[in-house]
C-alpha cells in the first residue's frame, strides 16, 4: 500500500531512468511548449532538457527543440552524449563541498555519509543520479530555472578535484598536501 501511495502524483516519475544498450543512464529533466505567433495563428514547438550519464563519473546535458516532443527529446539526448564531462567521485559521494552558479541559479553540494541518499531537488537530482553520486546533500538557491540549474551543477561537478589530482598538479604526494 505504501509503495502504491508513493507512485502517485509528482513522485511517480522521479526514479524513471532509461538504460540504453551502451549502458548510459538517460534522464528527462524538462519539456516545455513554446509558441510563436505568426500571421496565420500560433506555431507551437517543444523544447526538451535531458541529462545523460554512465553512473561512474561521466555526465552531459542536452537541449533540443522540435515541432514534436519525441524529436526534441531525441535531439537533446544526442547533444547530451556529445557534451560528456568527467567528474571525480569518492565512493559514491563528492570529495569536497561545491558552490557554483550559472546566471542567477546557485547550487551548493556537500558530501554525505553512506546511507544518506541523494537529497536534492528536480534538475540537480537528475544530474547527480546520472553521474553516479549515491550520497549527497544539495541545495539550489536563486533562480530555479532547470536549464541554468543543470548548467551550474555540471559546472560545479566538473570543477571539483580529487586530492590525487591536486597533488599531481602541485607535483607532490597526496600525503604531503595537508602538511605544507
Curated annotation (Swiss-Prot):
Domain S5 DRBM: 24-87
Gene3D superfamilies reported for this sequence: 3.30.160.20, 3.30.230.10
Pfam families per the UniProt record, alphabetical: Ribosomal_S5, Ribosomal_S5_C
InterPro entries cross-referenced by the UniProt entry: Ribosomal_Su5_D2-typ_SF (IPR020568), Ribosomal_uS5 (IPR000851), Ribosomal_uS5_bac-type (IPR005712), Ribosomal_uS5_C (IPR005324), Ribosomal_uS5_N (IPR013810), Ribosomal_uS5_N_CS (IPR018192), Ribsml_uS5_D2-typ_fold_subgr (IPR014721)
CC annotations in GO: small ribosomal subunit
Record's keyword terms, sorted: Ribonucleoprotein, Ribosomal protein, RNA-binding, rRNA-binding
GO MF annotation, one: structural constituent of ribosome
One of the protein's GO biological processes: translation
Family statement: Belongs to the universal ribosomal protein uS5 family.
UniProt remark on domains: The N-terminal domain interacts with the head of the 30S subunit; the C-terminal domain interacts with the body and contacts protein S4. The interaction surface between S4 and S5 is involved in control of translational fidelity.
Complex formation: Part of the 30S ribosomal subunit. Contacts proteins S4 and S8.
Function: With S4 and S12 plays an important role in translational accuracy. Located at the back of the 30S subunit body where it stabilizes the conformation of the head with respect to the body.
Protein name, per record: Small ribosomal subunit protein uS5
Amino acid at each position: 500500500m505504501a509503495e502504491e501511495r508513493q507512485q502517485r502524483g509528482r513522485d511517480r516519475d522521479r526514479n524513471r531512468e532509461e538504460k540504453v544498450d551502451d549502458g548510459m543512464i538517460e534522464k528527462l529533466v524538462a519539456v516545455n511548449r513554446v509558441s510563436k505567433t505568426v500571421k496565420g495563428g500560433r506555431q507551437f514547438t517543444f523544447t526538451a532538457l535531458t541529462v545523460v550519464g554512465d553512473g561512474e563519473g561521466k555526465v552531459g546535458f542536452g537541449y533540443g527543440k522540435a515541432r514534436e516532443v519525441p524529436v526534441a527529446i531525441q535531439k537533446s539526448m544526442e547533444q547530451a552524449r556529445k557534451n560528456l564531462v568527467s567528474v571525480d567521485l569518492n565512493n559514491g559521494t563528492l570529495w569536497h563541498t561545491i558552490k557554483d552558479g550559472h546566471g542567477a541559479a546557485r547550487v551548493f553540494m556537500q558530501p554525505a555519509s553512506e546511507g544518506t541518499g541523494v537529497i536534492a531537488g528536480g534538475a540537480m537530482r537528475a544530474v547527480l543520479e546520472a553521474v553516479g553520486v549515491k550520497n549527497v546533500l544539495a541545495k539550489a538557491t536563486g533562480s530555479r530555472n532547470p536549464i541554468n540549474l543543470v548548467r551550474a551543477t555540471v559546472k560545479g561537478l566538473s570543477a571539483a578535484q580529487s586530492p590525487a589530482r591536486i597533488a599531481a598538479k602541485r607535483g607532490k604526494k597526496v600525503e604531503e598536501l595537508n602538511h605544507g
